[in-house]
């Protein structure tokens, strides 16, 4: 393994780690702010955070990654580090189990449905926006 390759791998670990810290802190801060005005059993904070993450990950991988304006290490840091720690499948799963354990079946069903369908819709919107911006860049000659 070459020294350059080892250095790049170290850099990726550092970028993903720092981005992960920032993503986790952002999720925590946003979650706190949402729960200050939302006082119902439906886990709105986690749902909104995960939907935002779905949109931005799809947009990132469709638009930013294809533009070649950022090094792949930074794209990995943003996608895996920031967005990966910003979104939370485990919290979604635990909150769903808690709703079921409290016999809040309709809220659990609504939460799972909104999470899955909303995630697919937001990912689709992020992809569509990214694809639109790529095509716009191509027609304007900004794409490298």
UniProtKB/Swiss-Prot annotation:
Does the keyword section mention Transmembrane helix?
yes
Q: Which reaction does it catalyse?
A: fluoride(in) = fluoride(out)
Keyword line: Cell membrane, Ion channel, Ion transport, Membrane, Metal-binding, Sodium, Transmembrane, Transmembrane helix, Transport
What's any one GO cellular component for it? Answer: plasma membrane
Tell me which HAMAP family the record gives.
FluC (MF_00454)
Q: What protein family is recorded?
A: Belongs to the fluoride channel Fluc/FEX (TC 1.A.43) family.
Q: What is this protein called?
A: Fluoride-specific ion channel FluC 1
Biological classification of the source: Bacteria, Bacillati, Bacillota, Bacilli, Bacillales
């Amino acid at each position: 393994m070459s020294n350059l390759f080892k250095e790049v791998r170290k850099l990726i670990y550092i970028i993903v780690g720092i981005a992960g810290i920032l993503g986790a802190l952002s999720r925590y801060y946003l979650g706190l702010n949402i729960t200050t005005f939302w006082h119902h059993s439906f886990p709105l904070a986690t749902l909104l955070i995960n939907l935002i993450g779905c949109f931005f990950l799809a947009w990132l991988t469709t638009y930013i990654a294809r533009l070649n304006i950022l090094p792949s290490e930074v794209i990995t840091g943003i996608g895996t580090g920031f967005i990966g720690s910003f979104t939370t499948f485990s919290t979604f799963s635990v909150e769903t189990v808690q709703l079921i354990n409290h016999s809040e079946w309709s809220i659990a069903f609504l939460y799972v449905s909104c999470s899955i369908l909303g995630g697919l819709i937001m990912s689709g919107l992020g992809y569509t926006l990214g694809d639109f911006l790529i095509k716009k860049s191509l027609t304007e000659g900004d794409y490298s």
